[in-house]
Amino acid sequence: MKRLRVTLAQLNPTLGDFEGNLKKAIEALRVAEDRGSDLLVFPELFLPGYPPEDLMLRLSFLRENRKYLQKFAQHTRNLGVTVLMGFIDSDEDAYNAAAVVKDGEILGVYRKISLPNYGVFDERRYFKPGEELLVVKIGNIKVGVTICEDIWNPVEPSASLSLGEGVHLIANLSASPYHVGKPVLRKDYLSMKAYDYHVAMAYCNMVGGQDELVFDGGSMVVDASGEVINYGKLFEEEIITVDLDLDENLRVSLVDPRRRYMKTQNYPVKTVEAGNLREKSGHFEPVVNPLPVREEEMFRALITGLRDYVRKNGFEKVVIGLSGGMDSSLVAVIATEALGKENVKGVLMPSMYTSKESIEDAQTLAKNLGIETFIIPITDVFHSYLETLKGVFAGREPDITEENLQARIRGNYLMALSNKFGWLVLTTGNKSEMATGYATLYGDMAGGFAVIKDVYKTDVYRIGRWYNSWRGKEIIPENIFVKPPTAELRPGQTDQEKLPPYEVLDEILRLYIEEGLDPEEIASKGFDRKTVLDVTEMIRKNEYKRKQAAIGVKISTRAFGKDWRMPITNRFKEPL
């Protein structure tokens, strides 16, 4: 029987924290050794962290990365486990690489062949692609080494490893960023890939937040029939160990002979001998964790992104302007779940236009969450501004200027608290507002992290409803769900005076931003032509605001951040 004990170290590194990442790696190494593992797989670029971006241009960063790989190798002395460790190989150029480490030695290095250069990825800016396959032999078992995008490539190098080299297992070191629906997409894809090539797969994904990116984990082991026999937790660190029966590969190939007729490329191959299989005791039962519903998935991604941004950047507490509306309520909920109620501060900043209802809703929410609040009215300061500007504004009617003044006063208050106490200001704008420019630059956009900037308004409501249901009680007051959304910057104001109903707006935005449809195609789906053009024009005209917005968690297939690179100076208008 060909039985391989595989351990996947689904861990949360911090970019540039070589010492901290090494400590995590050593802890995982000890666990794998105690469990009698034959193979231990880490995520992509685990030692330096991912994505390193322009740190790749610093020789000192590359040298530290190499130094800590050697340090890690020393900790494998006299151990029986073979390790695949993600690092940067930078001898004659820079490569996204995996080192094969055992018993104090680096036995070989694999260099990533398929470098993604789309969406949030810029790997061709920093890395040279590898040109050689790497096969690790552990006893009579052959393991092919790949890194992230290598297995997303439809054919190679998976085909050459499985068909050409006859590997029993493809190990994949991954740092695959999250978007809504990505866990099930990834699970189905790897299942299909294993089935098509009749090869088992051990996929180790990173977990945690890095600036706007979230890595969701979901590491898995798939057998040669395409069955996911172990599926890790989402958004949590976990060390997974699986006993993998690799005799299944031959059984599947005999029943389904398609692979005999598949063609492969002629990559050069390096084979590394990593000793014998280990004597094993006991058996590690596989665990397939269930996938969460859509709202829970998004909620946990937002928690992960916020928690890690706060902690990894040295903050302890955050502050939020509480308006009594849905957006600030959801941000407060996410912050409380991510950081604990003692680390979240709420500020109510009422004006003469703020309703009693809004104040009560904000106070009820804060009480339900158990967070401390402060009330700092803006009315006197607002009147002082108007008095100061009276001469300059003489002869002009009140307009959006006076509305934006209120938002900017509130932004000043929050930033003053941030400066005085070291609290990180969380902005509360959603994707619908960021797309259309329905936000005030240096006002409600002022802050350090925009938690829900990639969440459409309709999804803000859905996540809020799910949260109350999950908690089994009304944390977010019902009145916040049912009252018309409003900025309360003048009497009787509602969002729908300037925007289409959010159910309409969000679908137009999704089709235009994420699906890339033209206005004509969107209108053909039943939307009013003028409304579609108005929305796309708002998107174009407000690029300057988005360029100055705080970063926030990416949860969609295309967010306003690393994967949205529109010019500000732009006279192109969508035709219809």
Swiss-Prot record:
<feature type="binding site">
    <location>
        <position position="404"/>
    </location>
    <ligand>
        <name>deamido-NAD(+)</name>
    </ligand>
</feature>
<protein>
    <recommendedName>
        <fullName>Glutamine-dependent NAD(+) synthetase</fullName>
        <ecNumber>6.3.5.1</ecNumber>
    </recommendedName>
</protein>
<comment type="function">
    <text>Catalyzes the ATP-dependent amidation of deamido-NAD to form NAD. Uses L-glutamine as a nitrogen source.</text>
</comment>
<keyword id="KW-0436">Ligase</keyword>
<keyword id="KW-0067">ATP-binding</keyword>
<dbReference type="GO" id="GO:0003952">
    <property type="term" value="F:NAD+ synthase (glutamine-hydrolyzing) activity"/>
</dbReference>
<dbReference type="GO" id="GO:0009435">
    <property type="term" value="P:NAD biosynthetic process"/>
</dbReference>
<comment type="pathway">
    <text>Cofactor biosynthesis; NAD(+) biosynthesis; NAD(+) from deamido-NAD(+) (L-Gln route): step 1/1.</text>
</comment>
<feature type="active site" description="Proton acceptor; for glutaminase activity">
    <location>
        <position position="44"/>
    </location>
</feature>
<feature type="domain" description="CN hydrolase">
    <location>
        <begin position="4"/>
        <end position="246"/>
    </location>
</feature>
<dbReference type="GO" id="GO:0004359">
    <property type="term" value="F:glutaminase activity"/>
</dbReference>
<feature type="active site" description="For glutaminase activity">
    <location>
        <position position="112"/>
    </location>
</feature>
<feature type="binding site">
    <location>
        <position position="176"/>
    </location>
    <ligand>
        <name>L-glutamine</name>
    </ligand>
</feature>
<dbReference type="GO" id="GO:0005737">
    <property type="term" value="C:cytoplasm"/>
</dbReference>
<dbReference type="InterPro" id="IPR003010">
    <property type="entry name" value="C-N_Hydrolase"/>
</dbReference>
<dbReference type="GO" id="GO:0008795">
    <property type="term" value="F:NAD+ synthase activity"/>
</dbReference>
<feature type="region of interest" description="Ligase">
    <location>
        <begin position="292"/>
        <end position="576"/>
    </location>
</feature>
<keyword id="KW-0547">Nucleotide-binding</keyword>
<keyword id="KW-0520">NAD</keyword>
<dbReference type="Pfam" id="PF00795">
    <property type="entry name" value="CN_hydrolase"/>
</dbReference>
<feature type="binding site">
    <location>
        <begin position="321"/>
        <end position="328"/>
    </location>
    <ligand>
        <name>ATP</name>
    </ligand>
</feature>
<dbReference type="InterPro" id="IPR022310">
    <property type="entry name" value="NAD/GMP_synthase"/>
</dbReference>
<dbReference type="GO" id="GO:0000257">
    <property type="term" value="F:nitrilase activity"/>
</dbReference>
<dbReference type="InterPro" id="IPR014445">
    <property type="entry name" value="Gln-dep_NAD_synthase"/>
</dbReference>
<feature type="active site" description="Nucleophile; for glutaminase activity">
    <location>
        <position position="148"/>
    </location>
</feature>
<feature type="binding site">
    <location>
        <position position="545"/>
    </location>
    <ligand>
        <name>deamido-NAD(+)</name>
    </ligand>
</feature>
<comment type="similarity">
    <text>In the C-terminal section; belongs to the NAD synthetase family.</text>
</comment>
<dbReference type="InterPro" id="IPR014729">
    <property type="entry name" value="Rossmann-like_a/b/a_fold"/>
</dbReference>
<feature type="binding site">
    <location>
        <position position="182"/>
    </location>
    <ligand>
        <name>L-glutamine</name>
    </ligand>
</feature>
<dbReference type="Pfam" id="PF02540">
    <property type="entry name" value="NAD_synthase"/>
</dbReference>
<dbReference type="GO" id="GO:0005524">
    <property type="term" value="F:ATP binding"/>
</dbReference>
<feature type="binding site">
    <location>
        <position position="118"/>
    </location>
    <ligand>
        <name>L-glutamine</name>
    </ligand>
</feature>
<dbReference type="InterPro" id="IPR000132">
    <property type="entry name" value="Nitrilase/CN_hydratase_CS"/>
</dbReference>
<dbReference type="InterPro" id="IPR036526">
    <property type="entry name" value="C-N_Hydrolase_sf"/>
</dbReference>
<feature type="binding site">
    <location>
        <position position="433"/>
    </location>
    <ligand>
        <name>deamido-NAD(+)</name>
    </ligand>
</feature>
<feature type="binding site">
    <location>
        <position position="428"/>
    </location>
    <ligand>
        <name>ATP</name>
    </ligand>
</feature>
<dbReference type="InterPro" id="IPR003694">
    <property type="entry name" value="NAD_synthase"/>
</dbReference>
